[in-house]
Amino acid sequence: CTSYLPMVCEGNNSANKLMTMGLVGFVYGAGTSEDTVSQLTDLTNYGALKADPGAANANGFTSTQVGGIAGFSNTSRTSTFANRFLRCINHGDMTVSTGRASGIVAAANRYTHLTDCTNYGLNDNAFPRSGYARLGNITCITGPGIKFTNVVNRGDLISRTKGAAGGILCLVNHNDNEFIGCESYGRVISDRPDNDYKGTFFGQCKKAAKFRNCIAQGDVGTYNGGDCIMTGVNADNYMD
């Protein structure tokens, strides 16, 4: 399925209430068998996305979450089988002010596998709470049972308000997470220090997650009022 229609979210009137936006808003699977999970296959989005959080201006579960393909993916707490995104592609640029926003799925919360998915879209974010946004061009945050295989980001990510950001994801949040053959080539721009929740691949990882045959290229920089200043990531400084 392919969509060219723009998507607009005008915000939520209630605080502390989840709102999701994407070609698919909320992806759920009981996770007890292959027949009780959701599978998104060959979905492509070209439509631009615009979103405002309204009163739901948090950066956690009870927030407005925007993804080019899906807003949120989750399974039950007893799940052992995963929701699957296969060959999903986002070309749509995002102009949003939500606490979570991503090219593929804003939150890969539990048991979600992404395979051969690519983001080309720009993620331009102006979350009103300075320093609080969690942004990643594939996803913002992971939970248990997450596996990304051959996932690629080629879009830039800009946080105008010092948000935490990563080219693939913002927060690696479980020890069992796996990233295999994943690549990021986009710029990550935010007025934060380069090693403070900001990176070409992920913003933060304090978990024993597995990374195999991944590429972290692109660049990091500061927004600087719109006159962006890039660090110039290279082989000599990319591990700083």
Residue ranges and their predicted role:
Residues C1-D240:
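Predominantly extracellular beta-rich ligand-binding scaffolds that present long acidic/polar faces
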